[in-house]
Amino acid sequence: MPISKVYARSVYDSRGNPTVEVELTTEKGTFRSIVPSGASTGVHEALELRDGDKSKWLGKGVLTAVSNVNNIIAPALVKANVDVTNQQQVDDLLLSLDGTANKSKLGANAILGVSLAASKAGAAAKNVPLYQHLADLAGAKTQPFVLPVPFLNVLNGGSHAGGALALQEFMIAPTGAETFAEALRMGSEVYHNLKSLTKKRYGASAGNVGDEGGVAPNIQTAEEALDLIVDAIKAAGYEGKIDIGLDCASSEFYKDGKYDLDFKNPESDPSKWLSGPQLADLYHELVKKYPIVSIEDPFAEDDWEAWSHFYKTAGVQIVADDLTVTNPVRIATAIEKKAADALLLKVNQIGSLSESIKAANDSFAANWGVMVSHRSGETEDTFIADLVVGLRTGQIKTGAPARSERLAKLNQLLRIEEELGSNAIFAGKKFHNGNQL
C-alpha cells in the first residue's frame, strides 16, 4: 500500500519544548507520530536537529527538521511508491536521503517521526494491531505475547531534580505481580504511599514531581532515597513483591576520570571524588542492603574498564544506556567487552525503527535483556507500549504512574493486555529474559 502524503508540524513535548509531529497518509487513513527528546543525552546519539535561533523557543525550535520532512522526505517517499508495510524499504530510503552516520543532515527527529508514522500505517494496511506488526517486523514470537514489568521512576535525583542526590532515577518494579494490570496497581499504591511519606519527612513541597512524575525531595544520599522507597513498599504491603531499579546516569557526574557524587555543589571537594572501583564498591553495598535487581549506567559512557570490572561481580542486571545509545556498533563493543547484559532501547537515540529493531535483536542474540524506554521530554504518543509487546522484551521504563504523557503508555499496555486475554503472559521475575519466555 503506497504512501499518498507526508506532512510534519512543530508541536510541544511534556517540558514545553518544540518537537516534531509527522502525519503519514495512505488509503487507510492518516497516521500520526510525535518524537520525544531527552535531557541527559549521550554524546554518541543520533543528532536531534534544533534550529538554534535564540529569538524563538530559546534556540530549541524544530522548524528546520519539520521543513526537511515537508520539502525533502515527503516528495521522495511519495514518489518512490514504497509499500508502507515494508518498513526496511521505508527506512533505507530515509537513511539514503540523509546520508550521514548520525543523521545530522535531515535530523534524527525528522527521520524518526516519518519512520514511526509509517509503521502505524503498515499495521493498518495489514489490519493488525501495531504490536503484531512490530512483532512481524522483528521476527518475534507471538504465542504468547509478553507483557512487560514496568520500571516506575518514583524518585528523581541527578540532572532531573534539585537537591544534592547524584543518582538520577530510583524505580520500583512490581515483579511479584501476576499480570500487568496488577503490577500497575501495586506500583500506583506504592507511589501514593511514597508521596505521603515524602511530604511527612521533607515538607509539603517535597511532594512536587519531576519531569517524569517522580518525587524529588531534598535528599543527600542514595541510602536515604532507598530507605524512603523501602518504607513506602512496606506501607503499601508489598514487601518481597516489588524490586528496585536504579538509573545512575553516571556520565553526568564524571569529572577528570573520577565520579563526583556532590556534582551539584560548585564547591565540591575533589579529594572526595570516587574512582571506578570505589563507586563499584558503593553499588555492591547498596545491592546487599536493598532489593535492587537492575542498575543502569553505573559508570560514564566511555569508562569501559569500570563497566567490565563491575559486570563480573554485579549479580544484578546491568543496563547500558549512555554507553550504547541504541547504536549497533556501540552495542557490539559492549557485548565483546562484557560491559553489561541489557540494552536500554530508545528509538530516538538511533533515529529509525529498523535500526531500533536490529539493536534489540543484536542484544537478544548475545543473551542480553532489553528495556524499552521513554525520554524525559515525552508526548501523548503511545508507540513504545506497542513496541515493548511486539519485541517481547519483558521490561519497560516510562516514568512514574503519574503525568499523562507517562500514563499514556501504561494505559495502552492495560488495553493491550486486555485485548490479548489468554494470549498474554506477564514477565514478572523473568523480566530479563522476556524474549525467551
From Swiss-Prot:
InterPro entries: Enolase, Enolase-like_C_sf, Enolase-like_N, Enolase_C, Enolase_CS, Enolase_N. Gene3D superfamilies: Enolase-like C-terminal domain (3.20.20.120), Enolase-like, N-terminal domain (3.30.390.10). Mg(2+) binds at residues 247, 296, 321. GO terms for molecular function: magnesium ion binding; phosphopyruvate hydratase activity. Mg(2+) is required for catalysis and for stabilizing the dimer. Pfam families: Enolase_C (PF00113), Enolase_N (PF03952). It comes from the Eukaryota. It catalyses: (2R)-2-phosphoglycerate = phosphoenolpyruvate + H2O. This is Enolase. The gene is ENO.
